[in-house]
């Protein structure tokens, strides 16, 4: 079986940690592609296209540690709370995820225990090794969804705990012409 997530080791002592929750479109064989066609698994609904490369490159540039998810967000969305209705999505951008419909509590628990919990334990283990970590989560987005309008921003900057650092980061990005929301 493929690793549930990949850890990137730091090349120097730095508080920076970069990760990608949606870096993979992989679905283990036992889930029969969740009833989807291969073309659906190549679309943005299955993963954040390009984020694995971005996480790896940023970790290399900054010599920092990181983590990359190894399963598709359609199997279980590692960027959602356990209580979120979108944890195991039944629809994404107009596409029905057939094998996620009427999921038994046992099947849900199995995905949580086998993918969600180990992934988050891995992040917590990495963060526990850092003093005052600065954490960046990498996501990508599609300029236009099948069921939506065009998005007008180049980048989103979401802040959970450290607004001053995020503001400095935003100011630095704007020097390069990035249009932020």
List where the protein language model places each region.
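N-terminal catalytic or cofactor-binding beta/alpha core of small enzyme domains
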Residues: 1-135, 140-181
């Amino acid at each position: 079986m493929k690793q549930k997530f990949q850890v990137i080791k730091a090349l120097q002592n730095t508080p920076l940690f970069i990760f990608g929750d949606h870096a993979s479109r992989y679905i283990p064989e036992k889930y029969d592609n969740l009833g989807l066609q291969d073309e659906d698994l190549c679309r943005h609904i299955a993963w954040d296209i390009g984020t694995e490369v971005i996480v790896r490159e940023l970790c290399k540039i900054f010599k920092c540690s990181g983590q990359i998810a190894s399963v598709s967000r359609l199997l279980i969305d590692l960027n959602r709370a356990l209580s979120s209705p979108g944890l195991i999505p039944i629809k994404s951008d107009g596409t029905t995820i057939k094998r996620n419909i009427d999921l038994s509590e046992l099947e849900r628990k199995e995905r949580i225990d086998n993918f969600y919990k180990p992934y988050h334990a891995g992040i917590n283990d990495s963060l526990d090794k850092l003093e005052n970590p600065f954490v960046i989560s990498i996501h990508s987005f599609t300029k236009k969804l099948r069921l939506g309008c065009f998005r007008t921003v180049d980048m989103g900057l979401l802040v959970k705990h450290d607004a001053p650092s995020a503001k400095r980061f935003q100011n630095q990005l704007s020097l390069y012409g990035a249009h932020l929301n």
